[in-house]
UniProtKB/Swiss-Prot annotation:
Pathway: Lipid metabolism; malonyl-CoA biosynthesis; malonyl-CoA from acetyl-CoA: step 1/1
The name this protein goes by in its record: Acetyl-coenzyme A carboxylase carboxyl transferase subunit alpha
One Pfam family cited in the UniProt record for this chain: ACCA
PROSITE patterns assigned to the protein according to its UniProt record, in alphabetical order: COA_CT_CTER
EC number: 2.1.3.15
Any one cellular-component term (Gene Ontology): acetyl-CoA carboxylase complex
Species of the source: Nitrobacter hamburgensis (strain DSM 10229 / NCIMB 13809 / X14)
Catalytic activity: N(6)-carboxybiotinyl-L-lysyl-[protein] + acetyl-CoA = N(6)-biotinyl-L-lysyl-[protein] + malonyl-CoA
Gene3D superfamilies attached to this UniProt entry: 2-enoyl-CoA Hydratase, Chain A, domain 1 (3.90.226.10)
Gene Ontology molecular function terms on file: acetyl-CoA carboxylase activity; ATP binding; carboxyl- or carbamoyltransferase activity
Function summary: Component of the acetyl coenzyme A carboxylase (ACC) complex. First, biotin carboxylase catalyzes the carboxylation of biotin on its carrier protein (BCCP) and then the CO(2) group is transferred by the carboxyltransferase to acetyl-CoA to form malonyl-CoA.
Keywords attached to this entry: ATP-binding, Cytoplasm, Fatty acid biosynthesis, Fatty acid metabolism, Lipid biosynthesis, Lipid metabolism, Nucleotide-binding, Transferase
Amino acid sequence: MPDPMRSYLDFEKPVAELDSKIDELRALAASGSDIGEEISSIGDKAAQALKDLYANLTPWQKTQVARHPQRPHFSDFIKGLITEFTPLAGDRKFGEDEALIGGFGRFRGESICVIGQEKGATTESRLKHNFGMARPEGYRKAVRLMDMADRFDIPVLSLVDSAGAYPGIGAEERGQAEAIARSTDTCLSLGVANVAVIIGEGGSGGAIAIATASRVLMLEHAIYSVISPEAASSILWRDSSKAQEAATNMKITAQDLLRFGVIDAILKEPPGGAHRDPAATVALTGDAIAEAFNDLRNLDRDTLRKQRRQKFLDIGRKLG
């Protein structure tokens, strides 16, 4: 059987079958059978099948990969990249929102402010973090942290992974739209360097609120859009089953968004996606983040602010 801890997507069935065959042969080998060459041969076939499959993913398949439950989350990047991380809680207006985590720590020896959505990896943690869908308190907390970082001249890193801001009645009553707008404006107005990385889903204003950065990076199989394919399908065709068609037409992939100038760079994922090797994904992402901050290191506050605002104005003019 394939690794019971690994969750295979529907389109990965051919790879799952090869992995299952390898596991069966390994069980035979453990009982004394000399089948090492056969195991190696099938292993090579599985690796090539995985490589070929992921080299030609459709936008809808990338959407599934971006949502994979074993994909590295915000907490994984914090553990792998940030030392001495100290999370801060509360928006000082209403309460705490654990869908959006933020705090201060050190990235490769230098002080940094980190904010981002945490989806959770278990049923309990997903409920705790509201599946990464932040309420107004989360975005107001992000504003509070960004203001602190700006005051103390500390760069800001945003790790984006959310289907969108939480659309509940309470969230709307407490000013969800205003909180998102305020967070977006704060990102644009920072006098310190800020880098955003789309690590999974970048959904609507909930993502943009912390992603209007000097450099926007995106993992190879992540997605970034104003609405989910399912919701777009329901609106356009009154039929959510056309999500695959919607995903194609919406241009939500990193490759499309780089071509449009919405993002600045695509970060390669390990063969088979980030969920197959989270540690390698985190390490590669860390290198790209360091390079992005290094590019911004010598820019003064006014230049950072002006270049960032101009960057997003240009995107609007180009795509408007």
